[in-house]
Amino acid sequence: MNEYEEGLKLLEEKFGCGKDNAISLATIAREPNAEGKPRPVVRTVDAYYEDTVFYVTTHGKSNKIQQIAENQEVSIATSPEMFTASGIGENLGWVLDPKNVELRTKLRQVFAQWYDMANNEKDENCCILAIRLTRGTLNINHWEKLYHMDFVNKTTMENGGVF
């Protein structure tokens, strides 16, 4: 097993296996700051992880979805697992869309304790956000071992990753 595969295995152990993960999700605000420069916006979301993608249920008119519609570049961070990553956000559409049936079933299971309270599936704006990781750094035991992963090219990055 190479280092990239080792890192993927650790990500699956930490975030996969049907876990409800609290992650910080950063997007770019639609309105620039006073100097006309982009402003980051961050919030905590519950996410399901599978095969280098985090999935979130949300509302199609939420700020995060509107921001991602204008700029798909996102970043995430977790604690205490110490994983930071960049990725591409994509609105997969209404949770009841037939193309989402398998994923919706998984999300309902993972988020069972609160899913129905937080989501109105009859509202066509109740949607699934996919965060497709592009690169990231998994920090094991406070800098004992760093896995700098390029998820697009499926390799490790020699010159550092995302901190």
Give short role names for the model-derived ranges.
Residues 25-29, 42-53:
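Short, basic, glycine/proline-bearing loop/turn elements
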Residues 13-37, 74-76:
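A short, Trp-centered hydrophobic/proline-enriched beta-strand micro-motif
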Residues 1-22, 156-158, 163:
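Extreme N-terminal tail/first-helix region
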Residues 84, 88-163:
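Charged, gly/pro-rich active-site loop segments
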Residues 21, 43, 72, 125-127:
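Residue-level marker for the onset of beta-strands and adjacent loop->beta junctions
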Residues 42, 51, 80, 133-135:
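Residue-level signal for tight coil/turn positions that link beta-strands
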Residues 18, 38-40, 61, 67-69, ...:
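Short solvent-exposed loop/turn micro-motifs enriched in small/polar/acidic residues
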Residues 47-82:
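A short mixed-secondary-structure module that forms the rim of ligand-binding clefts
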